[in-house]
């Protein structure tokens, strides 16, 4: 950055060789971009606002409240993890290669927030909106696992799940994928816990600590129902059984706040997410107040893009004009609807029955 003489916002994409610690700069964007939006929403640091102030001649220590975590001079302190996953719509094209590389093939992306890698990868794979229930519990089978693991495709993560279930070691999967063993170890934790859940035949038999840990690891009620009850066909009844058992044990997600930097009223930050990994609510629910919940359209895809998101934005703006508290639930970091100053409360989380209807 110093060599290029850039003042303001800039993002750099580079390739890194973990074996030699060598890296190559692929791209430099000295402007606001989709990567900027992702970084801003992942950290709560308003890059566009700060870059505009710098362009006007302000210095970082003059933006926000100096000497506090609310100053633009202070790097954000994160107590959560973020996972970005692209959405590929490759099945909608005849003859297209499913292999992914340095050229962009995705049509959208999602961002999941949580307290562990296991949680955010499972949430993220559900958010993609292509019929997957998480890292495990999907009706996928690969005839040649070694080939699927050695080729980077949009389905390789699910090939890793099947490989772990079939007894592949982390070292063997690493040799085939070159994915860092740290990530493979976290994915193995999910598979191991799936096997633990499968030991129970009734929802009532699952101990409270086992069920709670399953939720901490990102398992949905749907996944737990599939592993414990092994239902066929319509799973609505079994899903509700797990939900009822979980609520009976008092296992509910906590609502946590992401503090934004350089905001005028940090204590009023409305940028929220849900997790089972901790207890306690950073905000209280709106009670006895008129409020409207708007469900976003999720990741961009072929046939649903920014025009649908703008419908959500118009909905929350209209609700506010009519005197209602506006609540947005969405998880697309590219969109205007997930800007935390567009509504009274933004829940950056899954658009699912389990998350939208907590009680």
How would you name each of these model-derived features?
Residues 1-210, 214-218, 236-238, 248-257, ...:
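ATP-dependent carboxylate activation and anion-phosphoryl transfer catalytic cores
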Residues 213-217, 223-233:
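Extended, domain-scale alpha-helical bundle/helix-rich regions
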Residues 301-311:
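Glycine/threonine-rich flexible loop motifs
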């Amino acid at each position: 950055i110093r060599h290029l003489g850039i003042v303001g916002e800039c993002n750099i994409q580079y390739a890194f060789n973990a074996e030699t610690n060598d890296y190559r700069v692929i791209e430099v964007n000295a402007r606001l971009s989709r990567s900027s939006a992702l970084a801003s929403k992942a950290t709560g640091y308003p890059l566009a606002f700060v870059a505009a102030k710098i362009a006007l001649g302000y210095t970082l220590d003059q933006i926000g409240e100096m000497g506090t975590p609310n100053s633009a001079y202070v790097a954000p302190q994160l107590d959560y993890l973020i996972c970005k996953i692209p959405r590929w719509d490759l099945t909608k094209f005849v003859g297209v290669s499913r292999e992914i590389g340095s050229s962009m093939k995705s049509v959208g992306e999602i961002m999941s927030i949580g307290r562990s890698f296991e949680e955010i990868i499972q949430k993220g794979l559900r958010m993609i909106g292509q019929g997957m229930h998480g890292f495990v519990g999907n009706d996928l089978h690969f005839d040649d696992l070694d080939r699927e693991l050695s080729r980077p495709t949009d389905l390789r993560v699910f090939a890793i799940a099947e490989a772990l279930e079939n007894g592949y070691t982390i070292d063997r999967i690493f040799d085939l994928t070159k994915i860092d063993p740290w990530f493979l170890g976290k994915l193995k934790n999910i598979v191991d816990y799936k096997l633990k859940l499968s030991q129970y035949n009734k929802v009532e038999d699952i101990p409270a600590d086992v069920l709670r840990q399953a939720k901490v690891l990102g398992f949905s009620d749907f996944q737990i129902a599939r592993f414990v009850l092994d239902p066929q066909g319509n799973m609505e009844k079994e899903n509700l059984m797990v939900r009822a058992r979980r609520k009976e044990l008092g296992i509910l997600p906590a609502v946590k706040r992401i503090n934004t930097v350089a905001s005028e009223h940090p204590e009023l930050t409305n940028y929220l997410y849900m997790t089972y990994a901790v207890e306690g609510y950073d905000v209280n629910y709106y009670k006895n107040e008129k409020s409207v919940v708007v469900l976003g359209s999720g990741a961009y895809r072929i046939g649903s893009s920014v025009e649908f998101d703008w419908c959500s934005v118009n909905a929350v703006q209209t609700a506010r004009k009519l005197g209602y508290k506006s609540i947005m639930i969405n998880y697309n970091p590219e969109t205007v609807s997930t800007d935390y100053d567009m509504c009274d409360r933004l829940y950056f989380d899954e658009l699912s029955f389990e998350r939208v209807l907590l009680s």
